[in-house]
Amino acid sequence: MQLNGSQIIAEILVEQGVDTVFGYPGGTVLNIYDVLYDYSDRITHILTAHEQGASHAADGYARATGKTGVVIATSGPGSTNLVTGLATAYMDSVPMVAVTGNVSTAQIGKDSFQEVFIGGITMSVIPSTSCTSIPVILFTWFSIY
């Protein structure tokens, strides 16, 4: 059976021992949330009131548990709202992975609704633009931590 991008993300999170993720749902990550529901016996999702809170919660969780903090946000303002929490974790060498959505590949560079190049805002990001690159990128991040 061929897995889609959301299923690949969930499988790798479980494989890497992730049992808790923080986030705030939005249009471009709804497929991830659909899959997380199917994994709710293995991954607990903590819903926050704002993406920035989710980012700081993932940072705090990583500091308190020694595990990698994982945060999920949608495209555009959802992803930019993660920046302060990501920067805090980065500056203190706290292991954290952010999963964000984006507009469809065909819409990139066309000033689409909620299109933001988050990689340009966060220099320590390894962006993924296709399902085939998701496993490599996630394994790279988890191997760093």
What are these regions (language model features)?
Residues 1-145:
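N-terminal alpha/beta PP-like core and its mobile active-site loop of ThDP/TPP-dependent enzymes
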